[in-house]
């Protein structure tokens, strides 16, 4: 039994609760959780997931800063939709990162799931950036990441983590609905 994995999964549940509520407290937790998973993923040969956890840790600091940088007179950054002008650049970044990571994993590691690992990693980079900007559609990207990750983690015998990502899948659906509602409320106030 991997106690580090269990600790990471429990902290992940706390993170999920804060993210669902659009609470700024998701960010400190999003620094602790990936620090644990850097080790967990490396131990089972999910190298891209281990590296993406470093990104999550840094993105947690960035997201925290992004959410805090609004002045008191402006209030908290509102939930909004992803601007359409960003869709093509996001897709290009996704594609380039997916191919590069996939090639690196296939060529230089013993990963048994290089392309799946690359897919979840590249989608996660996009989703985390969208979360830092409070774009509601980040939940849809996480939905795909969570479904694919569930299968990967079962395959790798990370059952607690797979269970966590199963919960993430359900919460991603409801999180999208909740944030959509928050976005509509912020538009009504304007």
State each model region's role.
Residues 74-76:
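Membrane-helix interface linkers and caps
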Residues 55-72:
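Membrane-water interface of transmembrane alpha-helices
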Residues 15, 48, 63-66, 160:
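Short, flexible micro-motifs
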């Amino acid at each position: 039994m991997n106690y580090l994995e269990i600790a990471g999964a429990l902290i992940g549940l706390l993170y999920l609760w804060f993210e669902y509520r659009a609470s700024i407290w998701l960010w400190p937790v999003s620094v602790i959780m990936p620090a644990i998973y850097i080790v967990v993923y490396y131990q089972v040969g999910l190298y891209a997931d281990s590296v993406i956890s470093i990104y999550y840790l840094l993105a947690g600091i960035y997201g925290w800063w992004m959410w805090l940088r609004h002045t008191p007179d402006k209030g908290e950054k509102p939930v909004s939709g992803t601007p359409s002008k960003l869709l093509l650049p996001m897709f290009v970044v996704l594609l380039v990162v997916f191919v590069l990571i996939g090639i690196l994993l296939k060529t230089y590691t013993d990963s048994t799931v290089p392309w799946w690992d690359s897919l979840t990693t590249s989608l996660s980079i996009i989703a985390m950036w969208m979360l830092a900007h409070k774009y509601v559609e980040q939940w849809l990207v996480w939905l795909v990441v969570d479904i694919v990750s569930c299968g990967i983690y079962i395959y790798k015998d990370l059952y607690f983590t797979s269970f966590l990502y199963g919960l993430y899948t359900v919460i991603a659906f409801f999180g999208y609905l909740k944030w959509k509602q928050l976005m509509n409320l912020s538009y009504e106030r304007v």
